[in-house]
């Protein structure tokens, strides 16, 4: 029997990027934050590899990846950022994800997951 229909499986953005792709997104994101003159001082003395690991786990969940049992959100809030600075950090994430051509609702979901505003 011959089939002419294509079978598709719904895939999350995490499936397309994979763990290595999510790490690359986080590295680019942290570079943008570190290049911001107002935000860079908050990263001084911080264990950046550990921060990147936490952010990678949060972002992976926001993009449809496995939860890994980690608590969601608040990583940036603990640094003492103002609301405006916090939004700028999330805007940098949106810029990196937008550069990948991801849909708007996926970008917003990722921002919410990282900010701890949405159940993941």
What are these model-predicted stretches?
Residues 1-120:
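Core of compact, soluble alpha-helical bundle domains
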């Amino acid at each position: 029997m011959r089939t002419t229909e294509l079978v598709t499986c719904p895939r999350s953005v995490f499936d397309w990027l994979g763990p290595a792709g999510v790490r690359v997104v986080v590295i680019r994101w942290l570079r943008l934050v570190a290049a911001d003159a107002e935000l860079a001082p908050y990263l001084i003395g911080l264990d950046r590899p550990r921060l990147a690991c936490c952010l990678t786990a949060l972002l992976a969940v926001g993009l449809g990846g496995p939860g890994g049992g980690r608590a969601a959100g608040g990583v940036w809030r603990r640094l003492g950022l103002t609301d405006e600075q916090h939004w700028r950090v999330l805007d940098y994430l949106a810029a990196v994800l937008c550069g990948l051509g991801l849909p708007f609702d996926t970008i917003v979901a990722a921002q919410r997951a990282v900010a701890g505003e949405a159940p993941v």
